[in-house]
Amino acid sequence: MIIGSLKLKNPIFSAPMAGISDLPYRLIMKRHGAALVFSEMISANGLFFNGKATRDLLNSRTEERPLAVQLFGDEPGRLADAVKQVEGCGELIDLNLG
């Protein structure tokens, strides 16, 4: 499966889930065959206000790559800023606008 320039070995993804998709969970999913894992939902507002708990959600390891980072928010300017902040944190950025 190919998403943009990202080539994945299979179509198995681990969905972004608040309170679930932390680093240990993602590592387990990778060990069990997930080609792509997602971060927990990360608040654009939390990044804007530089919240430690929000920043901690961005912790990752090489062995879980490729990693998708999911951002959520409802203010376009803050979402744009959040995208810039997490650009190097994963191979894919997913925007949750709902």
Kindly label every feature range from the protein language model.
Residues 1-2, 6-12:
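Extreme N-terminal starter segment of soluble prokaryotic enzymes
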Residues 1-2, 17-91:
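Glycine-rich, positively charged N-terminal anion/phosphate-binding segment
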Residues 91-98:
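Short, flexible active-site-proximal loops enriched in glycine and acidic residues
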